[in-house]
């Protein structure tokens, strides 16, 4: 990698050798997108494309957060259509998968340490309630996702319609609140969740058939999934969990999102905003 200088923003950023920018092609018409075999993927794509088109400004947004998850695949894809020889913006990943999305779409790659102030960030969610409070962390990237989203001047959520809760968090998402913990503390945290916070159930997330043992985050921590049922006061729950010794971060994103776009298989998009 080598450093180039952004004349518009007066900020240096990382450029990728071997990536040659070409003349910009017209953006894909949202009404003429080729159909996908999976209707759920179509819902994710239309939500992501709409969110980018209605909120991203290549002239003013020079540092863009790119989240993790299956819907953000289409965010990166759409952002890639904005990149040409006259466009100058850098993308900040929230984890390994996010970094690969940025690279595969020939976008400029940066890091949050270099760009602590993010102009706009896009990310998915596991569930969104009526007040735009979120549960995130199903992909085990919650700490870095929260670091980027809270560093952004504008945070936009993209998801398919299944992620929209009719009222409370925990209504649709039944896997619990993801909590990132220091590995040596997991036994203590599990005990405190049950005995101090009356958690219904809590367990360390396992790696599945591909890995023996717990999921390990990009920060080398464990994830605990804690079921509290329907969460009527996510702000207080977040604060209570954060006070437990060993907790790094929770998957409750409070007062962070500005808008949420929910895609439907029929091609419609529902916009929820404060």
Curated annotation (Swiss-Prot):
Q: Which GO terms describe its cellular component?
A: cytoplasm
Gene Ontology molecular functions:
ribose-5-phosphate isomerase activity
Catalysed reactions, semicolon-separated:
aldehydo-D-ribose 5-phosphate = D-ribulose 5-phosphate
**Is Isomerase given among the entry's keywords?**
yes
| Keyword Isomerase attributed | yes
Protein location = Cytoplasm
User: What keywords does the record list, in alphabetical order?
Assistant: Cytoplasm, Isomerase
Q: Name one GO biological process term.
A: pentose-phosphate shunt, non-oxidative branch
* Pathway where it operates: Carbohydrate degradation; pentose phosphate pathway; D-ribose 5-phosphate from D-ribulose 5-phosphate (non-oxidative stage): step 1/1
EC number(s) stated in the UniProt entry for this protein = 5.3.1.6
Q: Which family does it belong to?
A: Belongs to the ribose 5-phosphate isomerase family.
| PANTHER family attached to this UniProt entry | RIBOSE-5-PHOSPHATE ISOMERASE
- Please identify the protein, giving its name as recorded: Ribose-5-phosphate isomerase
